[in-house]
Regions:
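Carbohydrate-active catalytic/glycan-binding domains of CAZyme proteins
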Residues: 20-457
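Bacterial Sec-dependent N-terminal signal peptides
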Residues: 1-21
């Protein structure tokens, strides 16, 4: 498996107690994070860099979603949209950076199709199923459709919604209340653009000595208190992250400086996402850490941060530690999806109509870890929903580390099919309080079993 070779250094860090939380998804290559806060959870939409890169370029066919209530354990919701959802487009590659928003109980996912413009999907749930409500691209009449990428959506305090996008300049429209059309009576058939001056976005000299705007792509627009923020990828290849502020969402914007500088383990592209969640602030971005430097195989990371008193954003450094403090302990006495993971090695996830998302590609020595599990006064039994079309294997249940205290071993037997699910159980030693919990998988050669959920009793 292509991801397995990337874990050696990170796995050693975990064994030595140097807790790694970044990148926050290890089962797939993910990029262009778009976090959305809804109903006590963060839903993060990402692009998906395929394991196999075709023609030495971004190979991206679909969009994935993850969610978390505590910012350390992330639940994989699988592929929530793909290029195939747009039957009017003939593109088989180019599922680039999306963003989602909720309005009036509906969820709108704005998807750029490289070379086919910005499209939109809608669903009744943040994890879908999404469908195409208009049967065509959303944005028309732009100067160059190849530059119509990286949409960011924002609803202002007065209810007016805006969609911004673009490389190498920022365009925007005023969305109508339905979120799937826009006001064409303003601008050029509805399309407007920001002033791309050095005052607005900073500047640097190009190869001809001409000072040009720093802005490159990946805009992220939001409001905090009375100030509007536009965070973006800047200064070409390799990119760093910068930001500008304004007192009106339509500008004028004022350049404020860097948020994240270039670094050796960052990919040659970057893409920001910024949220406040449960009274804390988080900055999302991507690196090529998981792929050992392959720029077309990126991985999402996140850093906690605090605004300065004047509202400015401090300079942030990418770290392996990421979010070190959980916002809430995990309750193991209710069903926990196996694809809720803080860290893992060697695993993949798949999705079926019978069970939804489950953990797959489980081989001997692979593991997953869940952070801050609250055992309360202790548990006596471990139960798991599993399926195996071979001789199966076992799940070692360990406390605090890969080689931590062994609470018990759940034997997984043959269930007569990889999608034939059974509940299998094991007695465990009593543990009290809050601990990280490791599931270490053991068995023979090849795939051992699939893992859908677990709970304690």
């Amino acid at each position: 498996m292509l991801l397995r070779k990337s874990f050696l250094l990170l796995a050693v860090s975990a064994v030595l107690g140097l807790q790694a939380q970044n990148p926050i998804v290890q089962t797939y290559y993910t990029a262009d994070p778009a976090p959305m806060v809804y109903d006590g959870r963060v839903y993060m939409y990402t692009t998906h860099d395929e394991d196999e890169t075709i023609n030495n370029f971004f190979t991206m066919h679909n969009w994935r979603a993850y969610s978390s209530a505590d910012m350390v354990n992330w639940t994989d919701h699988g592929v929530v949209a793909s290029l195939k959802d747009f039957t009017w487009s003939d593109k088989d590659n180019g599922a680039w950076a999306p963003q989602a928003i909720e309005r009036n109980g509906k969820f709108y996912l704005y998807c750029p199709i490289h070379g086919d413009g910005v499209a939109v999907l809608v669903a009744d749930s943040p994890t879908g199923p999404f469908h195409d409500p208009i049967g065509k691209r959303l944005i028309n009449d732009t100067p160059d459709i190849w530059h119509d990428i990286d949409p960011t959506v924002f609803i202002d305090d007065d209810g007016q919604a805006y969609l911004f996008w673009g490389n190498p300049k920022v365009f925007y429209v005023k969305l109508n209340e339905d979120m799937i059309s826009y006001d064409r009576s303003v601008g050029e058939k509805g399309i407007m653009s920001l002033d791309m001056s050095v005052e607005a976005f900073g500047g640097q000299k190009d190869e001809n000595g001409v000072v040009r705007s720093n802005y490159t792509e990946g805009p992220w627009v939001y409001k905090r208190k009375d100030l509007y923020y536009l965070v973006y990828a800047a200064a070409g290849i390799p990119e760093y992250i910068a930001y500008s502020t304004a007192t009106s969402v339509e500008g004028p914007w004022t350049y404020q400086g860097f948020i994240m500088e270039r670094a050796p383990h960052l990919a040659f592209t970057n893409h920001p996402g910024v949220i406040d969640f449960k009274d804390r602030s988080y900055f999302f971005y991507h690196t090529h850490e998981l792929s050992n430097g392959e720029g077309f195989k990126r991985s999402v990371s996140v850093e906690p941060f605090a605004y300065n008193e004047d509202g400015s954003i401090p300079l942030l450094k990418p770290t392996k530690a990421g979010v070190t403090e959980s916002l809430a302990p995990l309750n193991p006495f209710q069903r926990v999806e196996a694809e809720t993971i803080a860290w893992s090695e060697g695993l993949k996830t798949e999705k079926s109509s019978k069970t939804g998302v489950y953990v797959s590609s489980i081989n001997n020595g692979d593991y997953l870890m869940v952070r801050d599990v609250d055992f309360g006064d202790g548990a006596k039994r471990f139960l798991a929903g599993v399926a195996s079309g071979t001789e199966g294997g076992s799940i070692e249940i360990r406390l605090g580390a890969l080689d931590g205290k062994l609470l018990g071993v759940c034997t997984v037997s043959n269930t007569r099919g990889w999608n034939t699910w059974e509940v299998q159980a094991a007695r465990i030693s009593k543990a009290k309080g809050v601990h990280d919990l490791y599931f270490v998988f053991k068995g023979g050669e090849g795939d051992l079993f699939n893992f859908d959920w677990w709970t304690l009793e």
